[in-house]
A protein has these predicted regions:
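Flexible helix-coil transition and linker loops at the boundaries of alpha-helical arrays
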Residues: 1-29, 59-62
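Residue-level signature for tetratricopeptide repeat
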Residues: 42, 75-77, 109-110
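Long, ordered, amphipathic alpha-helical scaffolds
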Residues: 106-210
Length: 210
């Protein structure tokens, strides 16, 4: 009802006809966006994932720049629902930017789809984009993440850090709870990559000596 009331107040001004796509840029429509985001978040908390996806998509239509970060939660929802087509389209919509909260759910998506090569590729891309990804995955695999939660800033997180990964884990727990062995698998992928690099470096050093 709150959303309906807020929408009725905006309709006479023509915002839904003239300003769709730029709702966050207009001060008069920002409160409506906040109400809709709260509803979006509540749908997820209630486990109404299909309805949450629909509301998330609508929010992105109203605000194409996504100032509220709806795309991140929407990506986790697509991964949860194993919706590869919409997940890839969403990533492309935002220029396929290598962001923590895009790459990790995409890795989970392909893990759930049993496409481990693609999942591993996204894990490696995550590791390249976020300097703390290896540390995070190792701690998650060893069930030691509690050691880092005290470091969280209550006023927000710094992108591409452990803080962002922990924030993501808490906000999208429904996804990560659905794949209890994912972190152990992802950590083993990065360990294998590190071992391979060390062996390659060792061989290169031996060849130089010869």
């Amino acid at each position: 009802r709150l959303m309906e009331t807020a929408a009725k107040q905006l309709e006479p001004e023509g915002y839904f006809k003239e300003d769709v796509g730029a709702f966050w840029e207009i001060l008069e429509t920002r409160p409506y966006m906040r109400v809709c985001y709260t509803y979006f978040d509540a749908l997820i908390s209630c486990g109404m994932m299909h309805r949450a996806i629909g509301e998330g998509q609508r929010l992105l239509e109203l605000c194409e720049n996504d100032n509220l970060g709806v795309r991140y939660q929407l990506m986790h929802l697509y991964a949860y629902m194993e919706d590869e087509m919409h997940a890839l389209a969403l990533h492309k919509q935002f220029d396929s930017y290598e962001e923590t909260q895009m790459l990790l759910p995409l890795a989970v998506l392909y893990y759930k789809l049993n496409q481990f090569d693609k999942a591993e590729d996204y894990i490696k891309r995550l590791s390249a984009a976020n300097k703390d990804a290896k540390k995070f995955l190792r701690a998650a695999a060893q069930e030691r993440l509690e050691d880092y939660f005290d470091q969280l800033n209550p006023f927000g997180y710094q992108p591409f850090t452990m803080e962002e990964l922990l924030e993501e884990l808490m906000k999208s727990s429904y996804l990560f709870d659905s794949v209890p062995y994912f972190f152990a698998w992802a950590n083993s992928c990065l360990r294998a990559q590190t071992t391979a690099k060390k062996k390659a470096a060792g061989k290169a050093g031996s060849n130089k000596k010869l």
